[in-house]
């Protein structure tokens, strides 16, 4: 009798897992590793290429002039802090969204996505206003060199318009990541990098009869790339992936106060920690910025290498948040704990290899 109850209980457990998208049998460790590495490389590459869109300006301006390179590097420190905050908003969305995806409950997922988008747009608006009203004051945080300030102000005057588009892109990509759609992010970033580098080549140096705009040309390239990112992503989302989510433009006008409160409660600590990390990194430029243009330029190159290597860790955490969130949403706590132990081993290996 006890054996029959045990078998019945097991069958019930298997049935429950099936409802949430798992196989009737416990997935093997190898299957879990396979699922992890099907997403991980794409997320690492996507993060690398996303960083490269702004870093391409730094690299190509290095051949144009030291002051232009240093001016762009100073502005991109603001972008880095902003990106850290948007990453926190996106990670919070993935934490909640992947759980609802595991439960196959799409309605609350869409409402969480709407809340995240509202906070992202608010953040972009605040930053836009600050750098529009206090452009020189913002740049003086990083340097007092008049030539660098002049170049940085030209760059910031255009690059500030990218903040809105970047926020929309990052929140939409986090929404897709919640439901295990990651390939589009990498392809989108590659497109943005190609567009940015092409326009930089034409407008920074004035090739093929185009005007030589210097640092303004680099900013125009980045702005164009960010706008194209949003356009392509919106078309993809509402024509293809939107069907999987049941997502429509009107969904972003409706938020759930209870879900928004839960989202903010979880995301607020990440906003603080990510923001502090971004500020900590920017402070290095602040210190060097009161030295020479050469010091800022050298730090820009070193920081570029560091951020590219750091992408391996960012990709790992992004992948883990999706997979653990989905497992939590399935309601199988023992399986979730088992998966977390597997991830700890993976993180150790990734950390050693990255080092």
Features from the language model and the residues they span:
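Short runs within selected transmembrane alpha-helices of multi-pass transporters and secretion channels
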Residues: 90, 159-178, 185-196, 218-234, ...
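Structural signal for membrane-spanning alpha-helices in multi-pass inner-membrane proteins
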Residues: 131, 174, 200, 204, ...
């Amino acid at each position: 009798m006890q054996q029959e109850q045990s078998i019945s209980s097991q069958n019930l457990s298997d049935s429950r897992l099936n409802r949430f998208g798992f196989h009737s049998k416990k997935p093997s460790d190898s299957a879990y590793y396979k699922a992890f590495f099907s997403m991980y490389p794409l997320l690492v590459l996507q993060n690398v290429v996303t960083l490269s869109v702004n870093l391409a300006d730094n690299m190509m301006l290095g051949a144009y002039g030291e002051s232009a390179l240093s001016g762009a590097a100073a502005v991109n420190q603001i972008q880095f802090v902003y990106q850290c905050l948007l990453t926190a908003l996106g990670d919070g969305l993935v934490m909640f969204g992947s759980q609802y995806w595991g439960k196959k409950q799409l309605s609350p997922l869409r409402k969480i996505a709407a809340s995240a988008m509202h906070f992202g747009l608010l953040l972009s608006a605040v930053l836009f206003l600050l750098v529009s009203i206090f452009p020189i004051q913002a740049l003086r945080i990083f340097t007092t060199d008049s030539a660098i300030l002049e170049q940085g102000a030209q760059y910031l005057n255009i690059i500030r318009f990218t903040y809105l588009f970047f926020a929309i892109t990052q929140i939409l990509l986090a929404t897709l990541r919640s439901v295990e759609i990651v390939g589009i992010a990498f392809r989108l970033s590659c497109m943005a990098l190609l567009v940015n580098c092409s326009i930089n080549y034409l407008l920074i140096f004035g090739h093929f009869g185009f005007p030589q705009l210097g640092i303004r040309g680099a900013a125009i390239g980045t702005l164009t790339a960010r706008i194209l990112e949003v356009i392509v992503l919106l078309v993809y989302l509402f024509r293809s992936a939107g069907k999987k989510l049941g997502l429509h433009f009107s969904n972003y006008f409706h938020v759930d106060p209870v879900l928004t409160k839960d989202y903010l409660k979880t995301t607020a600590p990440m906003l603080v920690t990510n923001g502090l990390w971004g500020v900590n990194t920017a402070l290095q430029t602040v210190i060097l910025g009161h030295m020479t243009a050469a010091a800022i330029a050298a730090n820009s190159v070193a920081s570029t290498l560091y951020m590219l290597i750091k992408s391996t860790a960012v990709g790992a955490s992004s992948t883990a948040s999706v997979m653990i969130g989905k497992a939590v949403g399935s309601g199988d706590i023992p399986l979730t704990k088992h998966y977390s132990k597997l991830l700890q081993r993976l993180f150790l290996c990734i950390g050693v290899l990255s080092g």
